[in-house]
Amino acid sequence: MTKADIIFKENIRKIMEEGVFSENARPRYKDGNVANSKYVTGAFAEYDLSKGEFPITTLRPIPIKSAIKEILWIYQDQTNDLSVLQEKYGVQYWNDWEVEGTGTIGERYGAIVKKHDIISKILKQLEENPWNRRNVISLWDYEAFDQSAGLLPCAFQTLFDVRRVDGEIYLDATLTQRSNDMLVAHHINAMQYVALQMMIAKHFGWKVGKFFYFINNLHIYDNQFEQAEELLRRTPSEVEPRLVLNVPDGTNFFDIRAEDFELVDYNPVKPQLKFDLAI
């Protein structure tokens, strides 16, 4: 069993056995009912990408390409415009979070990246001094929240650091999420930010190192308990999937495309499970 599958099953069991139920929940299912969840707090995982450990489960198929396209929309296009996500990338699942009448998700994610010129600053800092300890992406902007409606960012903070090991420079990343839907979004979010880590590493010709993942509220919605039990019953693959970025070292961050990524040795258990999302 891969490391990701071990962690996935452990987290499902912990939530189902030790979790508590939410109260006064904000999300709603499409039928209008309150989307309560069972949750635990303070979940943490560590993956050493340089040793082939990747945070993707084989217990069900994960749509990696659309997840990577979303990260390009946020950090390359730097926009909140849903038409860009749909027309350029063919991704539509953010439509449910459109701020009515705006064609956007509000002043969130890509809009905040652009507002603060975050990626240019991160790349400049790493170029001038790779060992600086100030490489922080923060999408938590109270001013923007006051000015615009919209879902507050779940994956809201990413930090980068470097290590030199045997003459090679490795880029590590830490992703912090305030909230995470364990069954639907957990591995999507993790692999998105691994892709971002790989893009920055390629920009400088570095190797990817470790990926640290902290989630404040890790939950399973109350209409997903049957799917959770099914995932626990499934027998995962013994082969570790790998995400590969097929561009030369030194490729500019903004020139990398979704098709440059390849998921190798990925043979997830089927059939796919269906989930009614909480909005």
Swiss-Prot record:
Belongs to the thymidylate synthase family. Bacterial-type ThyA subfamily. It comes from Streptococcus suis (strain 05ZYH33). (6R)-5,10-methylene-5,6,7,8-tetrahydrofolate binds at D181, A278. Pathway: Pyrimidine metabolism; dTTP biosynthesis. CDD domains: TS_Pyrimidine_HMase. NCBIfam families: PRK01827.1-1. Homodimer. GO terms for biological process: dTMP biosynthetic process; dTTP biosynthetic process; methylation. InterPro entries: Thymidate_synth/dCMP_Mease, Thymidate_synth/dCMP_Mease_dom, Thymidate_synth/dCMP_Mease_sf, Thymidylate_synthase, Thymidylate_synthase_AS. This is Thymidylate synthase. Keywords: Cytoplasm, Methyltransferase, Nucleotide biosynthesis, Transferase. Catalyzes the reductive methylation of 2'-deoxyuridine-5'-monophosphate (dUMP) to 2'-deoxythymidine-5'-monophosphate (dTMP) while utilizing 5,10-methylenetetrahydrofolate (mTHF) as the methyl donor and reductant in the reaction, yielding dihydrofolate (DHF) as a by-product. This enzymatic reaction provides an intracellular de novo source of dTMP, an essential precursor for DNA biosynthesis. Signal peptide: none annotated. It is found in: Cytoplasm.
